[in-house]
Amino acid sequence: MLFRSAESSKADNSGTDGKVYNIGICQLVQHEALDAATKGFKDYLTEKLGADNVKFDEQNAQGDSATCATICNQFVSSNYDLILGNGTAALQAAYTATPNIPILGTSITDYGTALDKSDWNGVSGMNVSGTTDLAPLDQQAAMLKELFPDAKNVGILYCSAEANSKYQSDTITPYFKDAGYTVKSYSFADSNDVAAVAKTACDESDVLYIPTDNTAASNTGIIDNVATAAKTPIVAGEEGICKGCGVATLSISYDELGRKTGEMAYNILVKGEDITKMKVEAAPNVTKEYIKDRCDTYGIKVPDGYTEIKAE
């Protein structure tokens, strides 16, 4: 089933010469981080274009890759001016659907993995660019060590269907090992086996790390129940997962990330920048965040420099 809305917006329309820009937004799944990125993207373009000069066709694939393909093919048939792929599968579907329409990704961890480009250097040379939501993995590993200096076993929990999640697991593992931890990855295929895999991971680990992962983000309630029962704390790769089941995260602002993506779209549509030469951008700021109640429950001593956020 397709979940779809179309809307127009009014604001400052300087520089548009009255042109109406039609933008298709394919969002992989509904959850806090991706929702914020979509909102930031739309807000930026609304502010810059406005006055009925931009129309968004926003559709949510509800976590289904095949639906992403259907949505993006519809965008291509409509000959939209630009497509936003929010989430890895959404970007991949857009990339497969058209070599011509400019495509921007957001909430993407690693574009080389997403686009299957082994020689990725930050510029696609094609009709694809965008923003990455990856907070520096070495800093994430260092933060976990800061909070759990006496832990021995770190488990990494992620969805095997998400290529970017495996990339994060593979990339952060050496940093954990360098910090003196024994590391094991635990992957679940989809939402149906989250609970079983999470239980095994909790039983065999002193602390879990969950990277930015859309399926995990949509199942934090299940993961939290398992981890709480097992008394296994979780460090998360992004704020939404942390609020749902974690104790701490090194987080970016997904609204800020979406606005950065919107700025790139504006530069393509209005300023005529060549997307084939545009570098993938990252969020400008990262923040150490923690959930006080959960940290207190586990007896975690949180050093200075962390910002408190509330659990959901």
Positions of predicted regions on the chain:
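Short, small-residue-biased leader/transition segments that mark boundaries at the very start
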Residues: 1-2
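Hydrophobic alpha-helical segments within soluble ligand-binding/sensing domains
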Residues: 16, 111-151, 252-273
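Extracytoplasmic "Venus flytrap"
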Residues: 17-42, 48, 57-67, 213-218
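An alpha-beta-alpha
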Residues: 23, 41, 129-176, 274, ...
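Structural motif
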Residues: 55-77, 187-201
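Beta-alpha junction/loop-to-helix N-cap segments that form part of ligand/metal-binding clefts
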Residues: 60-118, 213-237
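Pocket-lining segment of extracytoplasmic ligand-binding domains
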Residues: 163-232, 238
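Flexible loop/turn connectors
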Residues: 241-290
